[in-house]
């Protein structure tokens, strides 16, 4: 699990009062995986998609007012002559909680979230593909999230805890 400390305002846009809340998801894991790959000489990019998560908690759905999760992040690594997608998303605790198999990554095939859980219920559905980026498109992501999740950002901007909403 990637844990980040809360800081006062992000250094990129200065408008996010608690940057760690916003980045405590799959996107920072993708940024970290991409940076780690690059640090050992593996060409890597960031990829983003909107997804529909059919196994979300009701608290989170109420907070976001939708089941569409925008800007789901993943890494794209250049291995053995081709680009391979890798989703660094759920830890084993989340997989167990929602009855999904942990994602495997063999370095040859794309590793995306499973479409169905272990009970054959819909789990993850990929909707919009934003493409690949050399760097995190932070301003674009924040602008998009603020317009799509006003209730969430109202809590964040008022320094309210959202910890129990997940």
Predicted regions span which residues?
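Secondary-structure boundary elements
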Residues: 1-21
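N-terminal start-of-chain detector that recognizes signal peptides
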Residues: 16-17, 45-50, 57-58
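Generic recognition of cysteine residues
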Residues: 10-16, 36, 78, 95
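Cysteine-centered nucleophilic/redox motifs
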Residues: 22-48, 75
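Weak global preference for isoleucine
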Residues: 6-7, 21-22, 42, 92, ...
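Conserved, aromatic- and glycine-enriched, well-ordered alpha/beta core segments
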Residues: 17-24, 62-64
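His-Asp-centered catalytic microenvironments across diverse enzyme cores
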Residues: 51-166
């Amino acid at each position: 699990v990637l844990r980040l400390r809360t800081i006062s305002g992000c250094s990129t846009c200065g408008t996010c009062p608690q940057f760690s809340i916003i980045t405590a998801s799959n996107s920072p894991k993708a940024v970290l995986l991409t940076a780690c790959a690059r640090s050992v000489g593996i060409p890597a990019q960031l990829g983003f998609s909107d997804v529909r998560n059919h196994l979300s908690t009701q608290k989170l759905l109420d907070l976001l007012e939708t089941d569409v999760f925008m800007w789901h992040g993943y890494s794209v690594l250049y291995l053995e002559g081709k680009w391979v997608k890798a989703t660094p998303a759920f830890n084993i605790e989340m997989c167990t909680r929602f009855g999904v198999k942990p994602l495997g990554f063999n370095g040859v095939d794309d590793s995306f979230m499973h479409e169905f859980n272990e009970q054959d219920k819909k789990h993850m559905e990929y909707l919009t593909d934003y493409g690949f980026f050399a760097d995190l498109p932070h301003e674009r992501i924040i602008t998009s999230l603020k317009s799509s999740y006003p209730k969430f950002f109202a809590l964040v901007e008022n320094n309210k805890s959202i910890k129990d909403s997940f």
